């Protein structure tokens, strides 16, 4: 699939040349992980020093809310772990790891969500979110929105408030943004599902 199907969204905040450079690094892999799926691989962005610098700059410049409006960044396993802690450190915020079930030591709290063929769960440690903490959720991709919604429910169950979402990529046509309850969100690039 050609890169021409990728729309520069909030990525434009870093300038056209840098935006086009970053998009050129995103690899489309048809048939992975199964037939009918086009996997959008942004690992080449992380391997490229210039691409990584552009990505982190763009994520910070395209925040859906001001840094003064959140206390912590929650990164969703696994690719949200790649840039969430770096963003948190650079912005002077804490980082919350939202993990797949069974990956954290007790005590944890969890939230289940539906998949196409079953269910999955995400967890955080019980002391990761204090009452009233304001959280920005970051991840590489929003598709159906199930994981982002489960992470929101989990953080709110723990007493926190999700104030927004920051995604590298958004797959259009899957209505994932509809599950974010109208909270502010940003995505750097948009692609067809």
Curated annotation (Swiss-Prot):
Catalyzes a salvage reaction resulting in the formation of AMP, that is energically less costly than de novo synthesis. Its EC number is 2.4.2.7. This is Adenine phosphoribosyltransferase. It holds the Pfam family Pribosyltran. One of its GO terms (cellular component) is cytoplasm. Gene3D superfamilies: 3.40.50.2020. Pathway: Purine metabolism; AMP biosynthesis via salvage pathway; AMP from adenine: step 1/1. It is found in: Cytoplasm. InterPro entries: Ade_phspho_trans, PRibTrfase_dom, PRTase-like, UPRTase/APRTase. Keywords: Cytoplasm, Glycosyltransferase, Purine salvage, Transferase. The keyword Cytoplasm applies. GO terms for molecular function: adenine binding; adenine phosphoribosyltransferase activity; AMP binding. It catalyses: AMP + diphosphate = 5-phospho-alpha-D-ribose 1-diphosphate + adenine. Belongs to the purine/pyrimidine phosphoribosyltransferase family. Homodimer. One of its GO terms (biological process) is adenine salvage.
């Amino acid at each position: 699939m050609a890169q021409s199907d990728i729309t520069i969204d909030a990525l434009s905040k870093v300038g056209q040349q840098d935006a086009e450079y970053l998009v050129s690094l995103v690899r489309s892999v048809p048939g992975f992980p199964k037939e009918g799926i086009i996997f959008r691989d942004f690992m080449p962005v992380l391997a490229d020093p210039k691409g990584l610098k552009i990505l982190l700059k763009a994520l910070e410049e395209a925040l859906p809310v001001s840094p003064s409006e959140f206390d912590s960044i929650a990164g969703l396993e696994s690719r949200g772990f790649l840039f969430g802690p770096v963003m948190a450190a650079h912005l002077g915020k804490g980082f919350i790891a939202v993990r797949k079930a069974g990956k954290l030591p007790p005590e944890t709290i969890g939230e289940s969500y539906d998949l196409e063929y079953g269910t999955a769960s995400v967890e955080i440690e019980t002391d990761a979110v204090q009452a009233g903490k304001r959280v920005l959720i970051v991840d590489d991709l929003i598709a159906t929105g199930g994981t982002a919604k489960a992470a929101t429910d989990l953080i709110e169950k723990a007493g926190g408030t999700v104030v927004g979402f920051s995604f590298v990529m958004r797959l259009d046509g899957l209505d994932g943004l509809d599950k974010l309850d109208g909270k502010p969100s940003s995505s750097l690039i948009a692609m067809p599902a």
